[in-house]
Curated annotation (Swiss-Prot):
Note, other: HIV-1 lineages are divided in three main groups, M (for Major), O (for Outlier), and N (for New, or Non-M, Non-O). The vast majority of strains found worldwide belong to the group M. Group O seems to be endemic to and largely confined to Cameroon and neighboring countries in West Central Africa, where these viruses represent a small minority of HIV-1 strains. The group N is represented by a limited number of isolates from Cameroonian persons. The group M is further subdivided in 9 clades or subtypes (A to D, F to H, J and K).
GO terms under biological process: DNA-templated transcription; monoatomic ion transmembrane transport; protein homooligomerization; regulation of DNA-templated transcription; symbiont entry into host cell; symbiont-mediated activation of host apoptosis; symbiont-mediated arrest of host cell cycle during G2/M transition; viral penetration into host nucleus
Gene3D superfamilies hit by this protein: 6.10.210.10, VpR/VpX protein, C-terminal domain
Superkingdom, taxonomy of origin: Viruses
Name the UniProt record assigns to this protein: Protein Vpr
Gene responsible for this protein: vpr
Amino acid sequence: MEQAPENQGPAKEPFNEWALELLEELKAEAVRHFPRPWLHALGQYIYETYGDTWVGVMAIIRILQQLLFTHYRIGCQHSRIGINPRGRGRRNGSSRS
């Protein structure tokens, strides 16, 4: 009869530690791009809606990821991935392959 392989790899970081580290990184990035009162209001909304639960942690992670992605995409001046309607980087209409 077949047996499951033994756990031979390095110990994986528990999900909750990973989620809290990710949340801290997202918060640090968000305060560089959004007003603190907005972020405080978002935190209050999440706390009032979900309380102090893992569902709340995952909700705020998802919202911060979406906010930051959208912010970068529509043209954060600190980002290189924004949409630029003026076609920055082109000279005289020529494009390089």
